[in-house]
Design a protein with these regions (language model features):
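Structural/interface elements that position substrates and couple domains in central-metabolism enzymes
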Residues: 1-226
Length: 226
């Protein structure tokens, strides 16, 4: 049975906007896990997130898997709106602007990872989430923007068999690894992609390649009930 709340227009608007901004903050925290594990090593962000999802009912399992940044037309817009309101009401703090800065910075860090492999870049998944065509607020486009700022053109949703490229799996897809040219690098944001070829590199974002946990994780796919 759906829960129905009766209230004023102002309460209704606040419910909608704070719902979206809360989810933005939660996604930012989840993605911070992979930013940290990318640097400290010996850690798989999916393992950490899975524990948080299941060990504490306060955290909850939805929107708690590190991956691409928060996106869509509503969440960024509502964060910007509440940032403006926080300033207008002289609250003295602005969590909402910080969430937007985190979103931007996480996209820039991901662009650095793609560029570091020294190959042409393709992003698989242009829309802001799987199963839709809408690109408003797409985190993939934000990553592509930072790549372009640093002098690297990005292609979308096409596997080129003729040259080695770095592919970002922005959506949880599983292309046949025979499609990739020799020497290609696959950066998987969801840490679920496995391949059988020795002449391509699969990089689980947030897991350092030299760590033993990286090898173990590749042979024990994570579970996700989100």
């Amino acid at each position: 049975t759906p829960h129905i709340t009766c209230g004023t227009w102002e309460e209704a608007e606040c419910i909608k906007i704070f719902h979206n901004t809360y989810l933005s903050a939660k996604v930012s925290i989840a993605n911070m896990i992979q930013d940290v594990t990318q640097r400290i090593g010996h850690a798989n962000p999916s393992t950490i997130a899975e524990s948080l999802r299941h060990a504490d009912r306060v955290v909850g399992h939805r929107y708690m898997e590190p991956g691409m940044g928060d996106g869509g037309p509503c969440h960024p817009r509502d964060n910007i709106a509440l940032s403006w309101l926080a300033d207008k009401l002289n609250l003295g703090y602005d969590l909402f602007a910080d969430v937007m800065r985190i979103r931007e910075r996480q996209a820039e860090l991901l662009s650095d990872e793609l560029i570091a492999h020294g190959l042409p870049i393709t992003i698989m998944g242009r829309a802001f989430k799987p199963g839709v065509e809408l690109t408003d607020g797409s985190p993939s486009l934000l990553v592509a923007h930072y790549c372009a700022v640093k002098g690297h053109t990005v292609q979308f949703d096409h596997i080129d068999r003729s040259e080695a490229r770095t592919y970002l799996l922005a959506h949880p897809v599983a292309p046949d690894d025979t499609q990739f040219a020799k020497g290609s690098v696959i950066v998987d944001m969801h840490r679920t992609y496995h391949g059988d070829r020795a002449d391509i590199t699969i990089k689980w974002y947030g897991v350092r390649d030299e760590d033993p946990v990286s090898h173990n994780a590749r042979h024990h796919p994570k579970t996700n009930d989100a």
